[in-house]
């Protein structure tokens, strides 16, 4: 009986040590991604790309056009998939950088292959989400400073907001923006995870950064060719146009779909990373 209690204590102690190591590694990875020059460059680059491609549209806007209308137009601009590229910059290339600098083996030895993989995957997803969230809110802030109203009930032009009609054209308009921006950010995080996994196969930074846009386009085209329900198209999901009930339910379900997509590639990345380390 004494041996069993001691054995249980040892397992608990080991678990606590592993968790401390994991949190330390994750803290370091988040610092490398979110608190980095690449993160700032990605946010500012995405904002600049949005306004550079939308400047012609803005020149035709009237003072009474609101943020809902302008934001909706921005979602269909040329090169609108660039948000996937910029979101992948801080985190998706982590493995490429470690592999090229031969830092990966040292990192894996300090913790474990599993902790290394899971930590990189979480940091990649979080940084991609934050790039889109910060950039999109920066866009809205610039438009407000430009003089456009958040919402104009008297505007004759209204956008179809799907499940968000009730909160969009109301005093809770910023809650609408929070929901659709977070949905778009989760989409970016999911495809950044795909890019992170691909980086274990092709350790080329440029291929890694372009991969999310190509995957998004191919998946969307393939689902259309297979005549699958349109509400599951990435193009519909990422814009918050797929309806799964009310605004809250739609947000949770849509973000859950992208989160599940991201988890699949996080697991694949961890396994592929382990094999890459074992085989050199």
Listing of model-derived features with the role each one plays in the protein:
Residues 94-130:
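Helix-loop-helix units of permease transmembrane domains in multi-pass membrane transporters
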């Amino acid at each position: 009986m004494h041996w069993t209690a001691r054995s249980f204590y040892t397992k608990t102690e080991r678990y606590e040590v592993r968790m401390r190591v994991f949190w330390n590694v994750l803290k370091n990875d988040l610092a490398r991604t979110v608190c980095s020059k690449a993160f700032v460059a990605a946010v500012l680059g995405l904002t600049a790309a949005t306004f550079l491609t939308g400047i012609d549209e803005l020149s035709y806007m009237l003072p009474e056009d609101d943020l809902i209308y302008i934001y909706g137009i921005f979602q269909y601009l040329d090169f609108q998939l660039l948000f996937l590229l910029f979101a992948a910059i801080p985190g998706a290339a982590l493995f490429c950088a470690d592999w090229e600098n031969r830092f990966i083996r040292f990192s894996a030895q300090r913790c474990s292959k599993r902790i290394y993989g899971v930590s990189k995957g979480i940091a990649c997803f979080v940084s991609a989400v934050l790039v889109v969230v910060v950039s999109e809110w920066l866009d809205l802030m610039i438009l407000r400073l430009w003089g456009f109203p958040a919402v104009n009930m008297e505007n004759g032009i209204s956008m179809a907001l799907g499940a968000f009609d009730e909160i969009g054209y109301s005093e809770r308009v910023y809650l609408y923006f929070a929901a659709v921006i977070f949905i778009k950010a989760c989409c970016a995080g999911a495809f950044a995870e795909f890019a992170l996994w691909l980086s274990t196969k092709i350790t080329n930074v440029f291929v890694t950064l372009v991969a999310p846009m190509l995957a998004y386009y191919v998946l969307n085209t393939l689902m259309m060719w297979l005549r699958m329900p349109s509400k599951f198209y990435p193009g519909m999901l990422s814009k918050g146009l797929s309806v799964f009930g009310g605004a809250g339910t739609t947000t949770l379900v849509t973000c859950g779909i992208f989160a599940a997509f991201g988890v699949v590639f996080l697991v694949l990345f961890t396994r592929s990373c382990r094999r890459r380390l074992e085989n050199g």
